[in-house]
Amino acid sequence: MTTLGTPLSPSATRVLLLGSGELGKEVAIELQRFGVEVIAADRYANAPAMQVAHRSHVLDMLDPIALRTLIANERPHLIVPEIEAIHTEALVALEREQGQKVIPTARAARLTMDREGIRRLAAETLGLPTSPYRFVDTVEEYRDAIAAVGLPCVVKPVMSSSGKGQSTLRSEADIDAAWEYAQTGGRAGAGRCIVEGFIDFDYEITLLTVRHAGGTSYCDPIGHWQQDGDYRESWQPQPMSAAALRRSQQIAKAITDDLGGRGLFGVELFVKGDEVWFSEVSPRPHDTGLVTLVSQELSEFALHARAILGLPVGAQDGGVIRQAGPSASCALLAHGNGVPAFDNVAEALRDPDTALRLFGKPRVDGHRRVGVTLARADSVDAAREKARVAAAALTIQLQA
């Protein structure tokens, strides 16, 4: 797609975002820079991407009839899934029956909507190294799986994100509570889970991998710190050996080549010395990649927009995306119930090498990521400290 129309006209190039969170918001902004007509959909009103889209829709995207009706009415040129909780079989059928273009492909959306599809592809079809694992449906299978993979281990619903339903089991005392949380915390309610054995790794990375008209390109590796299964900080570049980086790129290319299509993929990997293990992949921008808003000339969102529109992504020789220097991000979390408001914004931005993104989440119930601070410095450690200081300066209030 190299001819782009004018939004809100008969020539418009229309893109439908399925999921309208903070990552979708940044994708929508990048698409609008190219005059794309953006339609945002999600299960709740006033989601972040809806605030910058040409129009929006609220629906249950796990309902195939509602999803098909939306697509029939909007007639998008591209469908861009931004979350996992979508009736992907409907997308597969539409791609097969009507030639509907799903990014990167409907098959990729289906395989990555839950952990089972992508883990079986990576480990059993492609033979990529992974942690030991078992899939379970019942509490009896769950206990057998723990016995098989050993403690410590991790249990996750096959369909969840941002750490929801995920627990780390370090002793037998954790077993019952972890099962209960896995059955209540996933996106699709009670059901199938994965039990994963621990890997003794040095660090985790996200390798942002872009499939585009000119081939496959890679961003510098992103290191990250998680708590309760959810991203708290990320930084770029993550130092690693040349051998580990080559192996990471080989694994990323193997999985993204199999998934196919065009767009940006977030490939999560465990690294120990020169050894690398595949963890997960998202066929869309990744939350740890928010750091690229300041660390790269083209952010992960700009790269995704360019790739899906068939435009050059500005890769250097060797397929590496240009990086702007050591950078870091720190997530802003709100706890409680209400509509978020932010104080001390000027203080948070006092350092000229810091930036701030407030997502526009309409409400917090419990705990929610509502923004991110970003920083550049002469080293990754200094950038991380700047991002933390900026985050600590902000005060988040929840208003009734």
Swiss-Prot record:
Record key words, sorted: ATP-binding, Ligase, Magnesium, Metal-binding, Nucleotide-binding, Purine biosynthesis
Q: Does the keyword Protein biosynthesis apply?
A: no
* UniProt record, GO biological process: 'de novo' IMP biosynthetic process
Please state the span of the N-terminal signal peptide per the UniProt entry. none
List the EC numbers from the record.
Answer: 6.3.1.21
Query: Where is coiled-coil annotated?
Result: none
Where, by residue number, does Mg(2+) bind?
E268, E280
**Enzyme class at the top of the EC tree:** ligase
Q: ATP-grasp domain location, by residue? A: 120-309
What does the record give as the reaction this protein catalyses?
A: N(1)-(5-phospho-beta-D-ribosyl)glycinamide + formate + ATP = N(2)-formyl-N(1)-(5-phospho-beta-D-ribosyl)glycinamide + ADP + phosphate + H(+)
In which residues is N(1)-(5-phospho-beta-D-ribosyl)glycinamide bound? Answer: E22, L23, E82, D287, K361, R368, R369
- SUPFAM superfamilies reported in the protein's UniProt record: Glutathione synthetase ATP-binding domain-like, PreATP-grasp domain, Rudiment single hybrid motif
Pfam families under this entry?
Answer: ATP-grasp, PurT_C, RS_preATP-grasp-like
Stored HAMAP family: PurT
Assigned protein family: Belongs to the PurK/PurT family.
Listed under subunit, the entry gives:
Homodimer.
UniProt name for this protein: Formate-dependent phosphoribosylglycinamide formyltransferase
Organism of origin: Xanthomonas axonopodis pv. citri (strain 306)
